[in-house]
Amino acid sequence: MSEIQTASSPVTASSAATDELLVSVVIPALNEAESIEACVRRSIETMENHGIRGEVIVADNGSDDGTPDLARAAGARVIYEQRKGYGSAYLAGFASARGKYIVMGDADETYDFREIARFIEPLEDGADFVMGSRLRGKIHPGAMPWLHRYVGNPVLTGVLNLFFRTGVSDAHCGMRAFRRDLLPRLDLRTTGMEFASEQVIRSSKLGLDIREIPIEYHPRTGESKLSSFSDGWRHLRFLLVHSPTWLFLVPGIGMVLLGVVIGAISLFNVPLFGRQWQLHTLIAGSMLAIVGAQVAQLGVSARTYAFYYLGEHDPLFDRLRARLRLEHGLIAGALVFLTGLVMAGVVLGIWINRGFGELREEKLAIAGLALVVIGIQIIFGAFFLSILGLRRRSRALEDPQPPAAG
């Protein structure tokens, strides 16, 4: 099964002095001999024209067409990254950057590096992260396939905004700029195309000041290395696995509620759409509620893991976590379990009194057994969450607070 590839260690800011350099332009490249010189020269000329002290770094990702030599001849500092991937090249380039600000853009001439100064202005004004927006700017004819322009980018950007409340208009624009000293906090690790999504997500979760500027998007020089569906899926997959709320909690709670409604309609013989819903409807509702409870529990576990091990916060979850303890989960699970057990016990008692004859209380039995299963899930889920919380308690023991001075 395909997995999201990540770097073994986070990229950190270069320890080189930054007093003399304001900007590092980082350009990843893989066989971009036709366009790399123009990108490097435009970057250098733009910085010279605006009095910006900076450098251009080309992160070569295994080119065999002379791209590194052409970039070096044009005035760039070339570094080599053997690990394949869009993110790998950028991580290597970021680690070598020495400027106060990092401007990033592709090597295929789709982005105009003469716009560098426009990205620096918001950073000097206090922004942390500046993104270009092709959709609010100008997309030249032939620059972006209609599938990307009207389906892929809007859908993925919408999903990202829904999950992480970023409020950006073009989440996958490749021309961006940010403060280099934020690299340790961003903790960027993905090595593939989903790197673009990770950068936006991490910036949003950290509460950084994200701003957008409209830019122009030009037809690329050379052959495109994008794969519409596989790269789109990589981005969507990354968004899902980094949002337990939308991946687990929302569908899980939705399934529980729908299952309860369906089950209640059948259990209490509520007429709907002109008919009575029988036993099979209750079975379907019970199964839906059980599966939903399990999925929602996975979401709570993922949220707990993200808090203790990744340092991620969610206002609502943090309030619930602060108020609820293991005992609350055990009590809730026990109540659900005992309710189901009583229902099943009543059915068993009736069946015994009938001499184990015909059982006409199947609906009550199924509902009771469903509650028993859900109660067990809640009980053991509460124990699992408590185990995840051991990390907090162990840290408190390892690093006790010094006694107050008396």
Could you say what each language-model-derived stretch is?
Residues V40, I44, H50-G62, G375:
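Short beta-strand/loop segment that forms part of the nucleotide-sugar
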